Amino acid sequence: MTLDLAHYPLLALADTPEQLRELPQDKLKQVAKELRQYLLTSVSQSSGHFASGLGTVELTVALHYVYNTPFDRLIWDVGHQAYPHKILTGRRDRMPTIRQKNGLHPFPWPNESEYDTFAVGHSSTSISAAVGMAVAAEKEALGRKVVAVIGDGAMTAGMAFEALNHGGDIDKDMLVILNDNEMSISENVGALNSHLARLLTGNFFNSIRDGGKKLLSSVPPIKEFASRAEEHIKGMVVPGTIFEELGFNYIGPIDGHDVNGVVDTLKNMRNIKGAQILHVVTKKGKGYELAEKDPIKFHAVPKFNPSADGLPKAAPSDPTFSNIFGRWLCDMAQQDPNLMAVTPAMREGSGMVEFSQKFPAQYFDVAIAEQHAVTFAAGLAKEGQNAVVAIYSTFLQRAYDQLIHDVALQNLPVLFAIDRAGLVGADGPTHQGAFDIPFLRCIPNMVIMTPADENECRQMLYTGHKLNKPAAVRYPRGSGTGVKPDNTMQALEIGKSRTIRQGEKVAILNFGVLLPYAEKAAEVLNATVIDMRFVKPLDTEAVANVAKNHELLITLEDGATTGGAGGAVAEYLLSTVHTSRLLQIGLPDEFIMQGTQTEMYAEIGMDDAGIIAKAHTFLAQ
């Protein structure tokens, strides 16, 4: 699919930032208009992240117009809002392939484009990277500028403030753009603030300020008075005290959809030395009424008709594992008033909307603060509350010390409901849930469960909730296998597996939701199939039994094989006298790119065909 550029005459002239900078400034408003329409049309025909990019169109145009990218470094936080950036940096015609196998990466990716200066996908990393690049730029002494763009949501994370604290302290030349698209920091936007922003960034104001500081540096009382006067003038309309205290010169807020106003402000700010923050207010979903009204719903979209009155209704399907978790959470809360559910800003994705509405006193969204989420849950558990942390596998990585030091070390009964375990599909390598089993398995006191279907997931959540120690239940993105969960809940016997099929010579030890692949492969291989259920404690009795009676053991898991569940089986076999051969099948020692789960499991050789082929090859050796 290629869009007809005849409908985008100015955008057609700006395939790269170099071409964009050749246009007169009075054409930028039209460029932004065409860019927004191009984004709307392309994403509606291909799917992808949507509302965030609509809100950053003018800002993106202004940044590439003012700064000499890619020589000047532009770092996008997370990357949801970077679709306009991709369109303006030579990837316009490939936008229909975004998030698809062998297509454009879903987030900024340096291997894809020199304009993507830093790989991102998780939030709140941009300022830290920018501080490092600013130090390097000063050392190079080539006049390189460094700009980080971060949203107000990402600014809630501790890492962002750690970077601000350091960046303000060393005061290197850098600009942080706070893209405030939720009005959560300030609504104080208007002509006066836009005028003030241009005034405060202009040469006249800054020459007076810098010159005055030098002149009065030997007269401390007068210098202090002048500083207070400046702060008073700015403070009347500028809500930037916290940033000023951290050592950044704060400008704004300004209207992020006034492309010429943003350009003028950025041109002025290029000439200011030291650490700067520009507060830009934008509207998520800007220019598409439905997305403006419901930016959460339109954050990421399937293919849709822009002329329709909403997104297409999803075809009937089995409940997702997130749905299973959400239903269990509500059912459990009806029985347990001490259940406390915690999420780091992933209410919708984790299936917690209904719970948050029905049990608001037991629901805690701590914002993008994974470290705090885990230790907060530890505090709840220490005082007798039954804490449940709902978190994506890839984001649990960010709270590893808290997992060990604050939960496991004290053997606190915190249940981790780990969503998006295994391959997540279109979001690619930054979001694959590959590493949770390896990094959890080495932690003392931790119980790790891998449900094979919806009912096991529900029963394991109940088991972990009733267990008086740390526990984790990991489950994938998307729909289950069609197994209807039992309404009743029953605790499983810890560390015990179940036999699915009895065969000969080959035994498949399955951990998790790849069980249907294992069963199909077993029909061809005449293999025994064991649903292992628990990675830790491992059912060593079951492993020992199949090792006695089978020539080949195959471990199958939707996570990294290095240190994974297969590794646990290998370690046990090495510690005994069993001589069975072992084939570990799982995610290889590499970062897996984007594509559908089905596509990627087939490519890696983790589907039934791959299992059969690997087994035959292994047996032939």
From Swiss-Prot:
InterPro entries: Dxylulose-5-P_synthase, THDP-binding, Transketo_C/PFOR_II, Transketolase-like_Pyr-bd, Transketolase_BS, Transketolase_C, Transketolase_CS. Its cofactor is Mg(2+); thiamine diphosphate. Pathway: Metabolic intermediate biosynthesis; 1-deoxy-D-xylulose 5-phosphate biosynthesis; 1-deoxy-D-xylulose 5-phosphate from D-glyceraldehyde 3-phosphate and pyruvate: step 1/1. Mg(2+) binds at D152, N181. Thiamine diphosphate binds at H80, G121, H122, S123, G153, A154, N181, Y288, E370. It catalyses: D-glyceraldehyde 3-phosphate + pyruvate + H(+) = 1-deoxy-D-xylulose 5-phosphate + CO2. Pfam families: DXP_synthase_N (PF13292), Transket_pyr (PF02779), Transketolase_C (PF02780). Binds 1 Mg(2+) ion per subunit. Keywords: Isoprene biosynthesis, Magnesium, Metal-binding, Thiamine biosynthesis, Thiamine pyrophosphate, Transferase. GO terms for cellular component: cytosol. Its EC number is 2.2.1.7. One of its GO terms (biological process) is thiamine biosynthetic process. GO terms for molecular function: 1-deoxy-D-xylulose-5-phosphate synthase activity; magnesium ion binding; thiamine pyrophosphate binding. The keyword Membrane does not apply. Catalyzes the acyloin condensation reaction between C atoms 2 and 3 of pyruvate and glyceraldehyde 3-phosphate to yield 1-deoxy-D-xylulose-5-phosphate (DXP). Belongs to the transketolase family. DXPS subfamily. Homodimer. This is 1-deoxy-D-xylulose-5-phosphate synthase.
